């Protein structure tokens, strides 16, 4: 056999092994070890041939929170959800971490699952992780979706009451408290239906140790993407709500203006419309991720 034929055969064998491994690993929820870090993950197979979508959640939220959005997303898209260390079902790490550490961990997760490249969607705290992944693991990241997120410590902040409320995980632990504060904290649909927010947070979220929440807060301490955004070269969809007390709307405009290949879409609603009204945003996200070539940047509205 010629060296060319051997190379082709080896390549085919490699991809066949990867495909077989992916097929074996497609279970609902399981724990995998990436390096030395256990991660609780869930993989939804897709019917298409594109790269998978990594979903990075907000602070304190486990992978189950994405269930309503997942049901509305194009089934062609393979989806990988994960609990960051210390959240949901992922064990508490030995020490705090930074966003760069988590981005490297996600690259290792892709290796473990046999994927060369992925898209990433991040909401709120997870949007910071998505930006970091796109910047520090740029060859592994094809497209980016940023939902209700900002640029870290250098951004237009929420009001002091909102920041103080976010400093603890109480809303994940006390359903009555969640109902009382939902409208003022999350805005949008939560103002009219705080019980829906309480239902999502308490039905779909698996609460981890309180120290895990503190580790997430520590990861964002001192972090900003602002000076690096011109280096984020992937096509990016920025989704921002016009009634978001946690991430004021202007922060989405800042992101879209500094990311070279970004388009901005402003939706009517608050911080967690992605899971409260998934039909509002899932079609836009599905179209962006499945189109052959993303369109030109747009200022949105």
Regions found by a protein language model. Give the residues of each.
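Alpha/beta-hydrolase fold catalytic core
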Residues: 1-53, 76-77, 290-301
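Conserved HGGG/HGGXW glycine-rich cap/lid loop of the alpha/beta-hydrolase fold
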Residues: 37-91
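Active-site loop/oxyanion-hole signature of alpha/beta-hydrolase fold enzymes
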Residues: 81-121
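Flexible "cap/lid" loop of the alpha/beta hydrolase fold
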Residues: 131, 135, 141-171
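Conserved alpha/beta-hydrolase catalytic His-Asp/Glu region
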Residues: 175-228
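Short beta-strand/loop motif that positions the catalytic acidic residue
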Residues: 232, 238-240
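Acidic catalytic loop of the alpha/beta-hydrolase fold
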Residues: 243-247
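Catalytic histidine-centered segment of alpha/beta-hydrolase-like enzymes
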Residues: 269-282
């Amino acid at each position: 056999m010629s060296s060319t034929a051997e190379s082709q055969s080896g390549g085919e064998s490699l991809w066949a092994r990867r495909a077989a491994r992916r097929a074996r690993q497609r279970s609902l929820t399981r724990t995998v070890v990436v390096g030395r870090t256990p991660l609780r993950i869930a993989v939804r197979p897709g019917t298409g041939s594109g790269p998978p979508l990594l979903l990075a959640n907000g602070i304190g939220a486990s992978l189950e929170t994405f269930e309503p959005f997942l049901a509305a997303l194009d089934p062609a898209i393979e989806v990988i959800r994960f609990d960051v260390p210390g959240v949901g079902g992922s064990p508490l790490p030995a020490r705090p971490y930074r966003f760069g550490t988590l981005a490297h961990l996600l690259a290792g997760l892709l290796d473990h699952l046999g994927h060369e490249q992925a898209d990433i969607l991040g909401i709120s705290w997870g949007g910071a992780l998505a930006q970091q992944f796109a910047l520090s693991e740029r060859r592994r990241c094809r497209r980016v979706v940023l939902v209700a997120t900002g640029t870290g410590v250098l951004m237009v902040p929420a009001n002091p009451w909102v920041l103080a409320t976010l400093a603890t995980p109480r809303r994940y632990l006390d359903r009555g408290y969640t109902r009382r504060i939902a409208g003022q904290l999350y805005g949008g649909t939560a103002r009219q239906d705080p019980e829906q927010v309480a239902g999502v947070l308490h039905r779909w979220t698996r609460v981890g140790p309180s120290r895990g929440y503190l580790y997430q807060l520590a990861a964002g301490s001192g972090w900003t993407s602002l000076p690096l955004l011109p280096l984020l070269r992937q096509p990016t969809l920025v989704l921002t709500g016009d009634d978001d007390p946690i991430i004021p709307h202007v922060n989405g405009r800042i992101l879209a203006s500094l990311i070279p290949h970004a388009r901005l879409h402003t939706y009517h609603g608050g911080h967690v419309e992605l899971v409260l009204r998934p039909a509002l945003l899932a079609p836009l996200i599905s179209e962006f991720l499945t189109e052959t070539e993303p369109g030109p940047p747009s200022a949105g509205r």
